[in-house]
Amino acid sequence: MTTSARTSDLTRELARARARAIAAAVPDPELPMLTLGDLGILREVTADDAGVVVWITPTYSGCPALREMSRDVAARLAAAGLGDVEVRTALSPPWSTDWITPAGRRKLAAAGIAPPGPAPKRAPGPVPITLTAAPAAVDCPACGSADTVRTAAFGATACQDLYRCQACAEPFTHVKEI
């Protein structure tokens, strides 16, 4: 490998790492205390002489924030001078709340939102429609009590539900396990 080829490879790797850091720092439009990196939806970033390609996975099919996230990522990367930018969507494997980073879970709790527990395990292939048991107890992010009740199946977004703590009487949002 020639020196210029090694330099070109290094330049591409530095551009890829820079693009990944910029894309990972974009805030989620629905949960602005979290970044796309915190949510774990940033799947892959490639860079070459022509520009950058970023792959993201929506938190669920039909996520209304996907278009805005894609635009925000593209705008930030273009503003950083990284050439042509393309943001693509990866639907497989589907996103899981297990992909939320520990830092993201701490940020949710600090914002008064109960982070999700472990996602239910599913077999690969089509998702069967079944009746499920009542949701598991969710700890209150304010006082830590497990004495909570779900008050609504949907919160500000479809991926959230609403709870109230019986111990401290605080209402709070919970991110559903997906």
Where are these regions (language model features)?
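Domain-level signature for proteins that mediate thiol-based redox and metal-cofactor handling
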Residues: 1-178
